[in-house]
């Protein structure tokens, strides 16, 4: 059965079409439908996939719970998908929550005591767990036990509860914010990387089939190369391009139709959107190419510091548009060329190597 695309009207006001986070509840439901169910269907992340194949197979042979898994990397790369795949491959249930939701120790205790043997507990944004909840988690991860306080005042007493063996899968975009005691309790740690164009083209082709969309190989490649190395963005662009092709290109997504659709959406051939160009232009025009501190840059473009660091910068740094230096952000030669500008003959402040041959 074909999966119905969400309508343009379902999107919030002025979302970034290249945002790596979901932009609507409708999109989240479509993501679930497009999500691969098994490791053999999972495209990309070869190192993480190969490691998980071995660790899962070994755990199943022993009849044990898989060791606790930490998945970290930029948003939209498949951390939630991998958590679901782990549960599927282990043949167990997955319980899903997030760090901000677990406000009190009792919230976590209720989840842990309801887990069946070898189940998977997935905590997204695990770096946002409160310290008091995190303390409850330590003995649960090490000994499959928790201590809960019953009663109040002088009559209160601590009771130790045994838990079924389980696997915690934690996901975070900010691995550096994890406390050392929590990080040390994960036996399997996998960093997810941005995808290359060929991998994304395979994802786009698979998703197009599930969406009952007619796409050519060069059409899939055109969508993939503008998707910023992120499957979530690739699937979102695909749905918008499908809408365009149905109205303007007889329903066929080829390279020309994809290119025209994405140009209409203001996504350039390198996958940069208005916000990316706004940041790069601010560094070049307002700060002479940098270096500029992130707080000054945030004020200049009217964005939060966290938005710049977590959402805009990772892709720009990964692809050589920005360089982080001890003195701040600096535009690279790639940025000047992308903006159609001539870089200064010599950069000051120790950044001359950015423009040297």
UniProtKB/Swiss-Prot annotation:
Q: Which positions bind DNA?
A: 305, 324, 329
Q: Tell me the GO molecular function terms.
A: ATP binding; ATP hydrolysis activity; four-way junction DNA binding; four-way junction helicase activity
Q: Which GO terms describe its cellular component?
A: cytoplasm; Holliday junction resolvase complex
SUPFAM superfamilies according to UniProt:
P-loop containing nucleoside triphosphate hydrolases, Winged helix' DNA-binding domain
Region described as Small ATPAse domain (RuvB-S)? 196-266
Primary localization class, coarse: cytoplasm
Q: Where is this region: Head domain (RuvB-H)?
A: 269-357
The residues listed in the UniProt record as binding ATP, with positions renumbered to this chain, are: 34-35, 76, 79-81, 142-144, 185, 195, 232
Question: Which amino acids does the record list as binding Mg(2+)?
Answer: 80
Q: Do you know which SMART domains this protein is assigned to?
A: AAA
Q: Which reaction does it catalyse?
A: ATP + H2O = ADP + phosphate + H(+)
Region of interest (Large ATPase domain (RuvB-L)), residue spans: 13-195
Query: InterPro entries this protein is in?
Result: AAA+_ATPase (IPR003593), AAA_lid_4 (IPR041445), DNA_helicase_Holl-junc_RuvB (IPR004605), P-loop_NTPase (IPR027417), RuvB-like_N (IPR008824), RuvB_C (IPR008823), WH-like_DNA-bd_sf (IPR036388), WH_DNA-bd_sf (IPR036390)
Which residue stretches does the UniProt record annotate as biased composition, category Low complexity? 1-15
For biological process, the GO terms are: DNA recombination; DNA repair
Location in the cell reads: Cytoplasm
Which UniProt key words apply to this protein?
ATP-binding, Cytoplasm, DNA damage, DNA recombination, DNA repair, DNA-binding, Hydrolase, Nucleotide-binding
According to its UniProt record, which protein family does this protein belong to?
Belongs to the RuvB family.
UniProt note: domains: Has 3 domains, the large (RuvB-L) and small ATPase (RuvB-S) domains and the C-terminal head (RuvB-H) domain. The head domain binds DNA, while the ATPase domains jointly bind ATP, ADP or are empty depending on the state of the subunit in the translocation cycle. During a single DNA translocation step the structure of each domain remains the same, but their relative positions change.
Q: How does it assemble?
A: Homohexamer. Forms an RuvA(8)-RuvB(12)-Holliday junction (HJ) complex. HJ DNA is sandwiched between 2 RuvA tetramers; dsDNA enters through RuvA and exits via RuvB. An RuvB hexamer assembles on each DNA strand where it exits the tetramer. Each RuvB hexamer is contacted by two RuvA subunits (via domain III) on 2 adjacent RuvB subunits; this complex drives branch migration. In the full resolvosome a probable DNA-RuvA(4)-RuvB(12)-RuvC(2) complex forms which resolves the HJ.
Q: What does this protein do?
A: The RuvA-RuvB-RuvC complex processes Holliday junction (HJ) DNA during genetic recombination and DNA repair, while the RuvA-RuvB complex plays an important role in the rescue of blocked DNA replication forks via replication fork reversal (RFR). RuvA specifically binds to HJ cruciform DNA, conferring on it an open structure. The RuvB hexamer acts as an ATP-dependent pump, pulling dsDNA into and through the RuvAB complex. RuvB forms 2 homohexamers on either side of HJ DNA bound by 1 or 2 RuvA tetramers; 4 subunits per hexamer contact DNA at a time.
Designated name of the protein? Holliday junction branch migration complex subunit RuvB
Q: Which organism is it from?
A: Bordetella bronchiseptica (strain ATCC BAA-588 / NCTC 13252 / RB50) (Alcaligenes bronchisepticus)
Record gene name: ruvB
């Amino acid at each position: 059965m074909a999966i119905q695309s969400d309508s343009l009207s379902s999107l919030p006001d002025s979302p970034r079409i290249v945002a790596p986070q979901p932009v609507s509840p409708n999109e989240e439901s479509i993501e679930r439908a497009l999500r691969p169910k098994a490791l053999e269907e999972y495209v990309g992340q070869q190192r993480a996939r190969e490691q998980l194949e071995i660790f899962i197979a070994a755990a199943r042979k022993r009849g044990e719970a898989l060791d606790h898994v930490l998945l970290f990397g930029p948003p939209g790369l498949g951390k939630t998908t991998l958590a679901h795949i782990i549960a599927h491959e282990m043949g167990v249930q997955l319980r899903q929550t997030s760090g901000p939701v677990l406000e009190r120790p009792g919230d976590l205790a209720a989840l842990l005591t309801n887990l069946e043997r070898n189940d998977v507990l997935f905590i997204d944004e695990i770096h946002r767990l409160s310290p008091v909840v995190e303390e409850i988690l330590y003995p649960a991860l090490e000994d499959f036990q928790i201590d809960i306080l019953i009663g109040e005042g002088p009559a209160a007493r601590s009771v130790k509860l045994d838990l079924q063996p389980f696997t915690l899968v934690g996901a975070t975009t900010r691995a550096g914010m994890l406390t050392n005691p929590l990080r040390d309790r994960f036996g399997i740690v996998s960093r997810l990387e941005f995808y290359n164009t060929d991998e994304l083209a395979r994802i786009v082709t698979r998703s197009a089939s599930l969406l009952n969309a007619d796409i050519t190989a060069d059409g899939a490649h055109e969508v993939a190369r503008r998707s910023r190395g992120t499957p979530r963005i690739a699937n979102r662009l695909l749905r918008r391009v499908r809408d365009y092709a149905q109205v303007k290109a007889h329903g066929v997504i080829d390279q020309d139709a994809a290119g025209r659709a994405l140009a209409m959406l203001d996504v350039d051939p390198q996958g940069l959107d208005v916000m990316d160009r706004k940041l790069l232009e601010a560094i070049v025009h307002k700060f002479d190419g940098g270096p500029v501190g992130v707080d000054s840059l945030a004020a200049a473009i009217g964005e939060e510091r966290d938005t710049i660091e977590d959402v805009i910068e990772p892709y720009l740094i990964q692809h050589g548009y920005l360089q982080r230096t001890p003195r701040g952000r600096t535009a690279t030669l790639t940025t000047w060329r992308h903006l159609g500008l001539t870089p200064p003959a010599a950069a000051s402040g120790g950044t001359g190597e950015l423009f040297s041959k």
